[in-house]
Amino acid sequence: MMPGQIPDPSVTTGSLPGLGPLTGLPSSALTVEELKYADIRNLGAMIAPLHFLEVKLGKRPQPVKSELDEEEERRKRRREKNKVAAARCRNKKKERTEFLQRESERLELMNAELKTQIEELKQERQQLILMLNRHRPTCIVRTDSVKTPESEGNPLLEQLEKK
């Protein structure tokens, strides 16, 4: 018999096989008054064979209501803390993403400005070379001592020209 089940009224001490009247006690149902005066030895002998039927004499200890409430309260607090932490994590991630997006846009603008500046400097260089080449025939300085940018072996200028 499982705890919480109602005992079968058809099962009595006299109907159990091999038990018969238990150690001198009558097979009829015992009253509280009769149990008070019964010999403890006889009572123990009567109760012991009933263990195979899973008869539970005591109540199973149930958790106290306040313990259940405390456990539920702890769960609620833990869930609330987790919810707050998750929101904080999402906000930090969102802020980080927005920061990286702004930084990316700023760097792209800077890159575009630098490319524009490179193009302007290339054009200015070409104009200066052209002016120098136009001026050379009229210049009285010896051409042996002056090197023009075309004849110089400047690796930086060569790299810029290749681009």
Swiss-Prot record:
Residues 1-20, 58-89 are annotated as: Disordered. Gene3D superfamilies: 1.20.5.170. The keyword Repressor applies. One of its GO terms (cellular component) is chromatin. Residues 100-128 are annotated as: Leucine-zipper. Phosphorylation of Thr-148 by MAPK8 in response to different stress conditions such as, UV irradiation, oxidatives stress and anisomycin treatments. Polyubiquitinated; probably by IRF2BP1. GO terms for molecular function: cAMP response element binding; chromatin binding; DNA-binding transcription factor activity, RNA polymerase II-specific; DNA-binding transcription repressor activity, RNA polymerase II-specific; histone chaperone activity; histone deacetylase binding; leucine zipper domain binding; protein heterodimerization activity. The modification Phosphothreonine is found at residue 148. Its main location: nucleus. Residues 74-96 are annotated as: Basic motif. The keyword Signal does not apply. It is found in: Nucleus. Keywords: DNA-binding, Isopeptide bond, Nucleus, Phosphoprotein, Repressor, Transcription, Transcription regulation, Ubl conjugation. It holds the Pfam family bZIP_1. Residues 72-135 form the bZIP domain. InterPro entries: AP-1, bZIP, bZIP_sf. GO terms for biological process: chromatin remodeling; fat cell differentiation; negative regulation of fat cell differentiation; negative regulation of transcription by RNA polymerase II; regulation of transcription by RNA polymerase II. There is a cross-link at residue 65 (Glycyl lysine isopeptide (Lys-Gly) (interchain with G-Cter in SUMO2)). Component of the AP-1 transcription factor that represses transactivation mediated by the Jun family of proteins. Involved in a variety of transcriptional responses associated with AP-1 such as UV-induced apoptosis, cell differentiation, tumorigenesis and antitumogeneris. Can also function as a repressor by recruiting histone deacetylase 3/HDAC3 to the promoter region of JUN. May control transcription via direct regulation of the modification of histones and the assembly of chromatin. Forms a homodimer or heterodimer with JUN, JUNB, JUND, CEBPG and ATF2 thereby inhibiting transactivation by JUN, ATF2 and CEBPG. Binds multiple DNA elements such as cAMP-response element (CRE) and TPA response element (TRE) either as homodimer or heterodimer. Interacts with IRF2BP1. Belongs to the bZIP family. ATF subfamily. This is Jun dimerization protein 2. It comes from Homo sapiens (Human). The lineage of its organism: Eukaryota, Metazoa, Chordata, Craniata, Vertebrata.
